[in-house]
Amino acid sequence: MQFSYNLVVLIHVLATIIWLGGMFFIAIVMVPVLRRLEPPQKRIEVLSATATRFRMVSWIAILVILVTGVLNAVNRGVTLQAISTGEFFSSYFGKILTSKLILVLAMLVLSAIHDFILGPRLIELLSSSGTDSFQKLQKNRRYVSWLARINALFGILVVACAVMLS
């Protein structure tokens, strides 16, 4: 039992590292490097290829996180009865886990908006030209930038909640 629990926790942590680590790598390392890459068309190609690849990897990691998260909760004694009676939510563990789950849900929504709406729109705008496109590009970049910052903050808070649960 202990080995399987530890294995599930390890897989959960590794999937989280892939998701959050990838987000931080793109924001802190890749985007600043791409801004200096010449010619500009190469930036678009690298960003598009990387975004497409990371989108697939990150959503697989998210699926693994969700499955292992449920298994971890069950292994820690969370029951449907405790949830339905409200007993779960009155405990320290329940309050922290609920906070973590709300943050993860917010991250999932923000990630979906980024990956399936704003990110593809940004790639499309980077490929087009013209004054109107430039203004839309700047606006979209700001949205993507703020969305990434908020998601990163939520990611840090999720890790803080995980530490409090350990």
Language-model features: where?
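Polytopic transmembrane helical bundles with strong interfacial aromatic enrichment
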Residues: 1-166
